[in-house]
Swiss-Prot record:
The lineage of its organism: Eukaryota, Viridiplantae, Streptophyta, Embryophyta, Tracheophyta. Residues 57-82, 119-150 are annotated as: Disordered. It comes from the Eukaryota. It comes from Arabidopsis thaliana. Keywords: Signal. Belongs to the UPF0540 family. Residues 1-21 form the signal peptide. GO terms for cellular component: apoplast. This is UPF0540 protein At1g62060. Residues 57-67, 119-135 have a biased composition (Low complexity). GO terms for biological process: mucilage biosynthetic process; seed coat development.
Amino acid sequence: MNATKFVVLLVIGILCAIVTARQVEEVSKETKLGTSLPKSTNKGIGAQLSAAGLTYSGSSVSSSASAFNNPKGPGASASESGYTSTIGQVIAKGRKARVSSASASAATGEAAAAVTRKAAAARAKGKVASASRVKGSSEKKKKDHKGKKD
């Protein structure tokens, strides 16, 4: 999208917001941002604030090793697998809602095989780590009416 199209769409969006916004005696933060609220909800707007967070972290590892010396001679095999998963969800409502969620996962694997009689060897390793973090906050700040005349 070039700059001209962006500016045109921005102007159209602002004009639509101005045309559709209703006048409210006490202007709330939400109204200043472009949404319109009925006059009856201005005093209890703090109850509508909320914050939500979701985090997921998953890990998987698989290791396999194999060594054979045939016909019908020595053979070796080794296998390793692992999986970890963490999921967190936090939803908070209220005046000072805070959200914090953390998640971490780790999986390690190691496999080894060895054969004698003319030698055969195999080795496999695997390591996985995963992390996730979510933060959030919601608070309606009090208006400062100092020095203002009604």
